[in-house]
């Protein structure tokens, strides 16, 4: 299952047992694990305050492309306008569902699903 679909599923119900079962089902998803790690690790910061929501659909953004750009932000190789431009480039590639429900939430460090 795609990570943003998993997040949407987690958002759909407030039950702790439901959330545990969804996470248990998808425990072996490496992309989900890496995304959760980036998002929930307090020592990982991206150095950006604002991450816009997407209203347009791109072709789709694969995880490796996002991850390599995120590492540039984490390592502070992209700061200021360069960081903003990097994020806008990523946003233009991703579908609005991918961006708003997965990649953007990692960058703002809030999955908004009660995990």
Where do the language-model regions lie?
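N-terminal nucleic-acid-engaging modules of covalent nucleotidyltransferase systems
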Residues: 1-115
């Amino acid at each position: 299952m795609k990570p943003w679909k998993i997040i949407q599923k987690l958002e759909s119900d407030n039950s702790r047992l439901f959330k545990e079962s969804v996470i248990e089902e998808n425990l072996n998803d490496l992309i989900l694990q890496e995304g959760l790690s980036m998002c929930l690790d307090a020592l990982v910061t991206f150095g950006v305050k604002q991450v816009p929501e997407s209203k347009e659909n791109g072709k789709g953004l694969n995880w490796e492309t996002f991850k390599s750009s995120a590492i540039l932000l984490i390592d502070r190789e992209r700061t200021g306008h360069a960081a903003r431009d990097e994020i806008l480039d990523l946003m233009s590639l991703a579908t609005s569902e991918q961006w708003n429900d997965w990649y953007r939430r990692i960058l703002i460090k809030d999955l908004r699903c009660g995990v």
